[in-house]
Structure formats: C-alpha cells, structure tokens
C-alpha cells in the first residue's frame, strides 16, 4: 500500500477528530456540520477499503500534524493561506431537507464514477425540482455535497450523492449524473427542472424553464441508459 495513501488517511482522521471536538462545543454552523457528517461516512468507507483502524489512524495523524506545526512559522502559514483560493458553500436545501429520511416504492440505483444516483420509479406525472448543496471555486461547481429531487408537495423522489469509498469528482461527473437522473424521472412523464443556483454554477447559464443545456445526443444516450436498466 502506498505510504502517501496511508498518511493522508491518518491526517484526515485526525483533522476530522478536531472538527468533531469543535462541533461538540456547539460552535459549528450548518454547512460545517453537514460536511462533518459527510466526511465521517467517507472516512469509514476509506478505512474499510484500506483495512485501517480509524482510532489508530487518528493517533498517527495527530503525530504527523504536530510535527508539521512544530516546523511551521507564522509567516509561512500566512503565505500558504494567501495562496490557496477560497471555495464557497452554496445551499439550495435546508438542513432538514438534507437530513430527512426518504423511501422508494420502486427503487432504482446507478453508480456513475464516484457518484451514486437513486430514484423512485413509481413517481409519475409530477413536477419535480432538483436542489443541491455544493461548494464553488472560481465560480464553478467544485464538489457536490448532496443533490435531491423534490416534488411540489415536498416529497423526495431522487438523489445524487458522492460514494464515501470513492472520493473525488469533477463538475462534468456531476452534470452527467444529473442528466441520468433527469432521464430516469422523465421516463415516467415527470417534468423536471434544475434550481437556478445549480444551473448557474454547473452550466454557466440559467434557463427560465429550469432545464440545463444538455446536448440532444446526451439526452438520447441517457434515455437509452434508463430504458435498458428498467
């Protein structure tokens, strides 16, 4: 196993522990707590994949971080912070909408890269909106935290979420996954639109009908994908 993979996991475990202690003191805001829960699932998945114990990794990560801090000067820290572009966290959904449990009468699941797409194929003839919480850097979607599909009545009928065991995805991965979800929901004559915020940062455009500018070829491909899996 690559030593950098192990040490990266160890440092991530320790930094998660520090953030958890911060949250336990009721100092974290909603985006902070949301990322904390997501990262916990990711660490569990990575630990299982690597065959590493999280508690042991956390202790090792603490030693690595302490060694780095001992060597770090205040001036070097200021320069590092100044050189790193800041990302923004954008929210279409409330914390309640993100954490709410939901159930599917006819569940369908598809994995696309490091993203998991889930939808309820029992939903028909509904108006549906896709909402997402995600981070943005350089005015482009950076990381998807969670996307969910809601009916006008507020019911959750679909979802796109990162796989904890496969971290890392691009904005193109997210757009392709959204296309698959739209194709699956429209197969049952639902009308789907995407939130303005998600359109603006994923596609750099905003249509009044809420439809992202998917090329006709991509639409046909997605329709065939859903049809073959039903």
Swiss-Prot record:
Region CPSF4-binding, annotated ranges: 180-215
Pfam families for the chain: Flu_NS1
Chain segments carrying region RNA-binding and homodimerization: 1-73
Post-translational modification comment from the UniProt entry: Upon interferon induction, ISGylated via host HERC5; this results in the impairment of NS1 interaction with RNA targets due to its inability to form homodimers and to interact with host EIF2AK2/PKR.
Subcellular locations according to the entry: Host nucleus; Host cytoplasm
Keywords attached to this entry: Eukaryotic host gene expression shutoff by virus, Host cytoplasm, Host gene expression shutoff by virus, Host mRNA suppression by virus, Host nucleus, Host-virus interaction, Inhibition of host innate immune response by virus, Inhibition of host interferon signaling pathway by virus, Inhibition of host PKR by virus, Inhibition of host pre-mRNA processing by virus, Inhibition of host RIG-I by virus, Inhibition of host RLR pathway by virus, Interferon antiviral system evasion, RNA-binding, Ubl conjugation, Viral immunoevasion
Region (PABPN1-binding), start-end ranges: 223-230
Recorded superkingdom: Viruses
Motif stretch (Nuclear localization signal): 34-38
GO annotation terms (biological process): symbiont-mediated suppression of host cytoplasmic pattern recognition receptor signaling pathway via inhibition of RIG-I activity; symbiont-mediated suppression of host gene expression; symbiont-mediated suppression of host mRNA processing; symbiont-mediated suppression of host PKR/eIFalpha signaling; symbiont-mediated suppression of host type I interferon-mediated signaling pathway
Summary of the function given for this chain in its UniProt record: Inhibits post-transcriptional processing of cellular pre-mRNA, by binding and inhibiting two cellular proteins that are required for the 3'-end processing of cellular pre-mRNAs: the 30 kDa cleavage and polyadenylation specificity factor/CPSF4 and the poly(A)-binding protein 2/PABPN1. In turn, unprocessed 3' end pre-mRNAs accumulate in the host nucleus and are no longer exported to the cytoplasm. Cellular protein synthesis is thereby shut off very early after virus infection.
Subunit organization: Homodimer. Interacts with host TRIM25 (via coiled coil); this interaction specifically inhibits TRIM25 multimerization and TRIM25-mediated RIGI CARD ubiquitination. Interacts with human EIF2AK2/PKR, CPSF4, IVNS1ABP and PABPN1.
Name the UniProt record assigns to this protein: Non-structural protein 1
Organism encoding this protein: Influenza A virus (strain A/Turkey/Wisconsin/1/1966 H9N2)
